[in-house]
Amino acid sequence: MLLALAQWLQNDYSFLRVVNYLTFRAVMANLTALLIGLAFGPWVIRKLTELKVGQAVRTIGPQTHLVKAGTPTMGGVLVLVSIAVSTLLWCDWGNRFIWVVMLVTFGYGAIGWVDDYRKVVYRDPRGMSSREKFFWQTLIGLVAAVYLAFSVSESSNVRVWELFLNWVEGGLSLDMPYKSNLIVPFFKEISYPLGVAGFIVLTYLVIVGSSNAVNLTDGLDGLVIMPVVLVGGGLGVFAYVMGNSVYSKYLLFPHIPGAGELLIFCSALAGAGLAFLWFNAHPAQVFMGDVGALALGGALGTVAVIVRQEIVLFVMGGIFVVETLSVMAQVTWFKITKRRYGEGRRLFRMAPLHHHFELGGWKETQVTVRFWIITMLLVLIGLSTLKLR
């Protein structure tokens, strides 16, 4: 919005030309989201407390968590509003990738909101049924995946529609351009053609998987938001590179017109996340809830797909991956041993993994900060793939 206004007035006020610079708008988006979050955070927490939107805590978890019962949840609304206002103020409204990411982010946020609402109203920690939640995640994820399958390599929505029709008329068979290939980190000449179906399936898995992985990680004060900020910042760098024809050519990446604008979204995400951390740091004044975790995870997955860095997301978001795998391994091993021995056995003291360390004697703050440090290292490894190829 401000970009269009600045372009309209820049002939009379030359200093407004600075708004044309992507890096300037990214910095301003970050600061705007940060200030909105810090300014309205106390009010949001107070309102959530008045509405008795308190977190229900499972009694089977670490006993130290019982004191958290009643802490306001659904604080992710503050994060999403900060991101939305900041992004819409500083982005180019004509950029289609911005709207795709916003669709996924707020679509998944709506799913999380319903889930949190049911937990609060019915005092049931389970919230929405897994089947219902998965259905809506799948619907939104597939819509985004189908659109991105044809839009990543094309700059015109008209051309995207033509490619889609050609794909349908051709019996769901269509040659995809190089830009749609799966990029393998550290190898500049290795990429794998996915085809339309492969692209859609991979995109769906990345978006839905990332959303649920972030949600599973959100279990301790401040644990998930800092890794989200770090990974989002890393993806913002990739967005800037992929959207710049000079840098992408120099670094031997495919140029994706319009991808650079996602730097605005990632910057706003980082600013909103840091503002939320101000109130979510131990002892937390507010919890994110599914409304924030599902949305932010979906956002990271969508950005990663657009900038063709699905594998790098897997690396940078290693904490999310390990937390998810710990749950899968715990459930699988429990079922196998129950079938074999008549009683289920556990691989970990408790899943997700952060609870395993808590029950092993680590303080909550130790788990959180150590996971942050690991994420910092993983993000640096991910960023190193820009040049080490």
UniProtKB/Swiss-Prot annotation:
Q: Where in the cell is it found?
A: Cell inner membrane
From the UniProt record, which GO molecular function terms apply? metal ion binding; phospho-N-acetylmuramoyl-pentapeptide-transferase activity; UDP-N-acetylmuramoyl-L-alanyl-D-glutamyl-meso-2,6-diaminopimelyl-D-alanyl-D-alanine:undecaprenyl-phosphate transferase activity
| Alphabetically ordered keywords of this record | Cell cycle, Cell division, Cell inner membrane, Cell membrane, Cell shape, Cell wall biogenesis/degradation, Magnesium, Membrane, Metal-binding, Peptidoglycan synthesis, Transferase, Transmembrane, Transmembrane helix
Give the EC number: 2.7.8.13
CC terms in the record's Gene Ontology section: plasma membrane
Provide the reaction this enzyme catalyses.
Answer: UDP-N-acetyl-alpha-D-muramoyl-L-alanyl-gamma-D-glutamyl-meso-2,6-diaminopimeloyl-D-alanyl-D-alanine + di-trans,octa-cis-undecaprenyl phosphate = di-trans,octa-cis-undecaprenyl diphospho-N-acetyl-alpha-D-muramoyl-L-alanyl-D-glutamyl-meso-2,6-diaminopimeloyl-D-alanyl-D-alanine + UMP
In its UniProt record, which GO terms are filed under biological process? cell division; cell wall organization; peptidoglycan biosynthetic process; regulation of cell shape
| Chief location bin | membrane
Q: What InterPro entries does the database record attribute to this sequence?
A: Glycosyl_transferase_4, PNAcMuramoyl-5peptid_Trfase, PNAcMuramoyl-5peptid_Trfase_CS
TM ranges: 25-45, 74-94, 97-117, 134-154, 190-210, 222-242, 259-279, 286-306, 311-331, 366-386
Carries keyword Cell cycle?
yes
Write down the membrane topology: Multi-pass membrane protein
Q: In which pathway does it act?
A: Cell wall biogenesis; peptidoglycan biosynthesis
Which class of enzymes does this protein belong to? transferase
At the top level, the lineage of the source is Bacteria
Q: Do the record's keywords include Cell membrane?
A: yes
Q: Required cofactors, per record?
A: Mg(2+)
Which PROSITE patterns does this entry report, sorted A to Z? MRAY_1, MRAY_2
Q: Enumerate the NCBIfam families for this protein.
A: mraY
Q: What is stated as this protein's family in its record? A: Belongs to the glycosyltransferase 4 family. MraY subfamily.
In UniProt terms, what function does this protein have? Catalyzes the initial step of the lipid cycle reactions in the biosynthesis of the cell wall peptidoglycan: transfers peptidoglycan precursor phospho-MurNAc-pentapeptide from UDP-MurNAc-pentapeptide onto the lipid carrier undecaprenyl phosphate, yielding undecaprenyl-pyrophosphoryl-MurNAc-pentapeptide, known as lipid I.
- The identity of this protein, by name, is Phospho-N-acetylmuramoyl-pentapeptide-transferase
